[in-house]
Amino acid sequence: MIVLGLETSCDETGLALYDSELGLRGQVLYSQIKLHAEYGGVVPELASRDHVRKLIPLMNQLLEQSGVKKQEIDAVAYTRGPGLMGALMTGALFGRTLAFSLNKPAIGVHHMEGHMLAPLLSSQPPEFPFVALLVSGGHTQLMVVHGIGQYELLGESIDDAAGEAFDKVAKMMNLPYPGGPNIAKLALSGDPLAFEFPRPMLHQGLDFSFSGLKTAVSVQLKKLNGENRDADIAASFQEAIVDTLVKKSVKALKQTGLKRLVIAGGVSANLRLREQLETSLARIKAQVYYAEPALCTDNGAMIAFAGYQRLKAGQHDGLAVTTTPRWPMTELTIPE
């Protein structure tokens, strides 16, 4: 089965072809970073308009790159949610229309399920069950993954997601968009122990809270009164986030008795986080798994793969086009 995956939940237009026999046949990705940079963040209307402009050219590029003919596509998977309504709708309409024209099934995929299953595309995928740390601009969650659609929520952020905190602190520091990678880059030349920022809720279950940390950074920046300590601020802030994510992940593994941790979402690309996770998990003889670097950020491959998992179980959508900007993963059903 060859599945076309479409990702348009935010500011990346990603398309990919997943072949159940040959694996990933090809993928293309267009990022809108330059478009939104002058605004310091994603402008939803501009994002959806740019998806409209890019979908057909990228589709043609993907078919040429992969050597697959449009008529060979067996099904279409598109991101149904969560995400920006207009951006989601462009991908959903494109995908559902294409599937209808080819007389093929289509299915809407949960964006974070795509991220969480992306490590299964690697050469050494994790086996079920495992603990998943989903960490992105919109999500910070710990879950036990028993199988496709079998997700048990252990804890989540009660306010800002980790990626959102990165972006907001970057804005406070007048760093360019996207904030997370720029903070990580600046942190390389800073001292992570220079400022003692809080680790909210560190010893309170498996939920997260990052709004207090964000406020602490704001207060410290005002105290500096123009003194340039940006590298130290970035390093200390990043260390607080990483320390919290690592310790909660270790706690989740101990609590569940599992020895496999999958980390997924845009923040999973953070090198300091990976370094600290590997060190901490080695101490408890546990293993950490990531998606391939190209599959850490938003992409069509993860949607194609997640869609395939549900399509092969017989799931597909009707003719109605549905998008769900707010969609808890705990609402997902088990394929039958």
Swiss-Prot record:
Fe cation binds at residues 111, 115, 298. Its main location: cytoplasm. GO terms for molecular function: iron ion binding; N(6)-L-threonylcarbamoyladenine synthase activity. Substrate binds at residues 134-138, 167, 180, 270. InterPro entries: ATPase_NBD, Gcp-like_dom, KAE1/TsaD, Peptidase_M22_CS, TsaD. Keywords: Acyltransferase, Cytoplasm, Iron, Metal-binding, Transferase, tRNA processing. Required for the formation of a threonylcarbamoyl group on adenosine at position 37 (t(6)A37) in tRNAs that read codons beginning with adenine. Is involved in the transfer of the threonylcarbamoyl moiety of threonylcarbamoyl-AMP (TC-AMP) to the N6 group of A37, together with TsaE and TsaB. TsaD likely plays a direct catalytic role in this reaction. This is tRNA N6-adenosine threonylcarbamoyltransferase. It comes from Acinetobacter baumannii (strain SDF).
